A protein has these predicted regions:
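N-terminal positively charged helical leader segments and presequences
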Residues: 1-50
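Short, polar loop motifs at secondary-structure junctions
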Residues: 4, 22-28, 134-135, 150-152, ...
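Structured adenosyl-cofactor binding patch, chiefly the S-adenosyl-L-methionine
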Residues: 57, 95-97, 108-125, 178-218
Length: 218
């Protein structure tokens, strides 16, 4: 993990930081494991970003177990989402809208991917993430699975999102298949000429509609 801000957020969220590597002239992060001071130029060689941050850390993964689904009322499901930036943005939107957890089906990009972590702006540490879980398991928890589509289903604003729901969003290129294991279909009506919204944009719209309905009671 790269960057003092993200490392600090991981510490604040209770994640276990094993050790940190600090560039010359930079201050280590308090509580972020053993400190390794690097010689000049080393950070440029080990960092993954073009403009390296002065602090890099090794962090133990701390994702949630499937049991969280038993009590969750608002779930976001990323089904085969491949782009790290999209998943990071989805995590950020889900956390901001108050989702109880984000479920990643098999084949979805790794949430510990550095690009996911950066795009999430730290949300990956704050919203529970359940990995390698399929839609059957979500349904068995008694959650209504709402498949998203560009061409079928009720409008998201006409759908009762106050229930225990899982908003299911598919792969960027293919979306959800017509025979996806969902209970209902919803769509985002829009006036533009494009066929559909980007998956991360759609996630944001839907998450905040869930939040709006739950605040207003309708």
């Amino acid at each position: 993990m790269e960057g003092a801000v993200l490392v600090s957020e991981a510490v604040d969220a209770g994640w276990h930081v094993i050790e940190q590597f600090v560039a010359p002239g930079a201050d280590p992060i308090s509580g972020a494991g053993a400190v390794r001071h690097l010689a000049p130029g080393v950070m440029d060689k080990i960092a993954t970003t073009e403009t390296p941050q002065p602090v890099l850390a090794v962090v133990e993964r701390a994702f949630a177990g499937r049991e969280i689904l038993d009590t969750a009322g608002f779930v976001v499901v990323a089904d085969g989402v491949a782009d790290p930036g999209n998943l990071g943005t989805m995590l950020r939107s889900a956390e901001a809208a108050g989702a109880d957890c984000v479920v990643l089906t098999p084949g979805t990009v790794d949430p510990s991917n550095p690009k996911v972590v950066r795009a999430s702006a730290g949300a990956v540490f704050r919203v529970p993430v359940v990995e390698d879980t399929n839609l059957d398991e979500v349904g068995l928890a008694g959650i209504v699975r709402l498949g998203t589509s560009s061409h079928r289903g009720a409008s998201h604003t006409d759908t009762d999102l106050r229930r225990r729901v899982a908003v299911v969003l598919g792969n960027e290129a293919h979306g959800l298949s017509d025979d996806a294991n969902v209970d209902e279909w919803i769509t985002i009506a829009h006036a533009g000429r494009s066929e559909s919204l980007n998956v991360a944009m759609a996630c944001t719209v839907l998450c905040f509609e869930v939040a709006r309905q739950r605040r207003s009671g309708s």
